[in-house]
């Protein structure tokens, strides 16, 4: 669903980058919705970043290359109002614990499920928080420590 929405948004010549967020104004890298929503960007915007960036390390925090300056036109997608992502969960795949949680979800829900299905599943299985809890603070610490230099010329 969100892939289609992002593709549609990128057809607008006034948009270079689209991602999920909890605000229409300011990017929040720790918002849980990011684990569910892919980001999309135009090839022209990516080429421009590659030309202007001052660092070779662009792995951690790549979205901020698009959101931390006025060069790129960014659009944020808000989650549907009835979708509430619990703070004690994360849905990215950065650590082995993330993958372990993903395997549990997929083994129970199969390959075709929605965000709502996942949220209902974790509500019915609150013990799953124990899988992911050790990496919540670790991710925040690692993110701050390893975030790329977003400076561009």
Kindly label every feature range from the protein language model.
Residues 1-89, 100, 104, 120-153:
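Conserved core of the sugar-phosphate nucleotidyltransferase
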Residues 39, 92, 111:
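Residues that recognize and position ribonucleotide moieties
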Residues 55, 111-112:
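Alpha-helix boundary/capping and short turn/kink residues
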Residues 95:
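Short, conserved phosphate/pyrophosphate- and ester-handling motifs at nucleotide-, phospho-/glycolipid
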Residues 107-108:
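A hydrophobic, small-residue-rich beta->alpha segment in the mid-to-C-terminal subdomain
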Residues 117:
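Structured alpha/beta or helical-core interaction and ligand-binding surfaces enriched in interleaved
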């Amino acid at each position: 669903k969100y892939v289609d929405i992002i593709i549609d948004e990128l057809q607008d010549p006034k948009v270079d980058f689209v991602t999920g967020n909890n605000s229409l104004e300011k990017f929040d890298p720790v918002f849980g919705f990011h684990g569910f929503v892919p980001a999309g960007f135009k090839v022209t915007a990516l080429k421009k970043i590659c030309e202007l960036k001052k660092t070779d390390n662009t792995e951690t925090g790549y979205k901020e290359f698009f959101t931390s300056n006025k060069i790129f036109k960014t659009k944020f997608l808000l989650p549907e109002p009835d979708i509430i992502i619990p703070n004690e969960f994360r849905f990215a795949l950065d650590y082995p614990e993330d993958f372990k949680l993903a395997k549990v979800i997929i083994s129970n829900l199969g390959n075709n499920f929605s965000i709502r299905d996942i949220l209902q599943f974790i509500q019915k299985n609150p013990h799953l928080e124990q899988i992911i809890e050790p990496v919540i603070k670790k991710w925040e610490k690692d993110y701050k420590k390893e975030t790329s230099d977003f400076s561009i010329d």
